[in-house]
């Protein structure tokens, strides 16, 4: 009897540890469903139907592997990726890495902040500038949760992730994509035009986010007081699998909904979020348009919080400089207000920011692969040969795609 109680207590204790250790991947996963994803996925689905769904599938598989490597670097070493680069790279390289990582973080935050402002505009009928002000206030309130520790923030952001996923289950119900065509688009690679390659790079840049590669390792580096190293890694694998599967589903649903609703109804020119919202109303009804607006708002608010956190990790990790998180939020809001006041087309800014992000992926991945493939550093948590080779393949694909983009832009294709 006492033995069975002991076993039961042990099982409950393990469950508590597993639950306590889950959450960091949900924060990272928010970076994979930000407003930049909305913009690129809607444009890709409206323009090419289901033909680019395979890009989302493979980008999500890549993202899952990358985030697992980032998370286990923090668990195995107690340091994040930026700190390892600072400790092991020459000083000029460290400064270069810091500058490009800050630029990437700013481009990310610009897209996320403007996306949330558009969400407020669509749902509540305010101006874009008023939406930006509301976004600033809302993100301040969410960031203040950090004063209560990491877990409350994980729960709020995880809840917003699940809300966006639920919203897209509803959108799929409204749009009713053709399952056979959808599955074919997921399985058969196709890049029909040069513009499709540009959009594929945007989808890749929107799906694999450099700033959350840095962030995830910092979220797991201080979990040493919660369970053994093997327990932490086991929980992290489950955490990453669940969170990234949800993010992958949302991205697929975004593109499939755009394909079913816009591409096959003669609205393949839908290229911005306002237009998507206004076009959804007559095609699928007010409820579908409202759900779209709310999901954009939830994704924008949560992802801009994550972007602010990532920017702080990058600055502290690379140059040991710390500024209060709320002050950083004020500073990083400025480019968004400049874009809005200048009257630039916000969705175009979103899509171009995602292309810019794709150039930062390889720069984050190369040192991540080097560190997680080092047995002296990682011990028994070193990458397997399969994971290391898959990581190298991701780097090659990203560099090749970026090279094509540079040539295409230079030739104005």
From Swiss-Prot:
InterPro entries noted in UniProt: NRAMP_fam
Transmembrane segments: 19-39, 49-69, 94-114, 122-142, 155-175, 196-216, 240-260, 287-307, 323-343, 349-369, 393-413
Chief site of localization: membrane
Disulfide bridge partners, by residue number: none
Record keywords: Cell inner membrane, Cell membrane, Ion transport, Membrane, Symport, Transmembrane, Transmembrane helix, Transport
GO BP annotations listed: iron ion transmembrane transport
Location within or outside the cell: Cell inner membrane
Lineage: superkingdom: Bacteria
One MF term in the entry's GO annotations: metal ion binding
Membrane topology: Multi-pass membrane protein
GO cellular component, one term: plasma membrane
Role summary: H(+)-stimulated, divalent metal cation uptake system.
Family listed: Belongs to the NRAMP family.
Protein's recorded name: Divalent metal cation transporter MntH
């Amino acid at each position: 009897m006492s033995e069975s109680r002991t076993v039961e207590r042990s099982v409950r204790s393990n469950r508590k540890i597993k639950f306590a250790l889950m959450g960091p991947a949900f924060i990272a996963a928010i970076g994979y469903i930000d407003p930049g994803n909305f913009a690129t996925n809607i444009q890709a689905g409206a323009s090419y139907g289901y033909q680019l769904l395979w890009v989302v599938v493979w980008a999500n598989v890549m993202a899952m592997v990358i985030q697992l490597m980032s998370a286990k670097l923090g668990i195995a070493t107690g340091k994040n990726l930026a700190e390892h680069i600072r400790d092991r790279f020459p000083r000029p390289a460290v400064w270069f890495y810091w500058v490009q990582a800050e630029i990437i973080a700013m481009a990310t935050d610009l897209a996320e902040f403007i996306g949330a402002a558009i969400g407020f505009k669509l749902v509540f009928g305010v101006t874009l500038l008023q939406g930006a002000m509301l976004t600033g206030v809302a993100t301040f309130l969410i960031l203040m949760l950090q004063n209560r520790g990491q877990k409350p923030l994980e729960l709020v952001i995880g809840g917003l992730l699940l809300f966006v996923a639920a919203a897209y289950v509803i959108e799929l119900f409204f749009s009713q994509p053709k399952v056979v065509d959808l599955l074919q688009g997921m399985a058969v690679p196709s890049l029909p035009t040069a513009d499709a390659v540009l959009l594929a790079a945007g989808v890749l840049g929107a799906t694999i986010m450099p700033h959350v590669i840095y962030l995830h390792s910092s979220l797991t580096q201080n979990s040493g007081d919660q369970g053994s190293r093997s327990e932490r890694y086991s929980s992290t694998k489950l955490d990453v699998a669940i969170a990234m599967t949800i993010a992958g589903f949302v991205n697929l649903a975004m593109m499939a909904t755009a394909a079913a609703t816009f591409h096959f109804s003669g609205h393949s020119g839908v290229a911005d979020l306002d237009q998507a919202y206004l076009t959804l109303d007559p095609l699928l009804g007010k409820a579908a348009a409202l759900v779209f607006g709310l999901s954009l708002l939830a994704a924008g608010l949560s992802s801009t919080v994550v972007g602010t956190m990532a920017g702080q990790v990058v600055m502290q990790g690379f140059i040991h400089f710390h500024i209060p998180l709320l002050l950083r939020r004020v500073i990083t809001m400025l480019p968004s207000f400049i874009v809005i006041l200048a009257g630039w087309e916000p969705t175009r800014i979103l899509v171009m920011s995602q292309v810019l992000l794709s150039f930062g992926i390889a720069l984050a991945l190369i040192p991540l692969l080097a560190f997680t493939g080092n047995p002296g550093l990682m011990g028994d948590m070193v990458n397997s040969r399969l994971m290391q080779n898959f990581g190298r393949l991701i780097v090659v694909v990203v560099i090749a795609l970026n090279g094509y983009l540079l040539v295409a832009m230079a030739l104005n294709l």
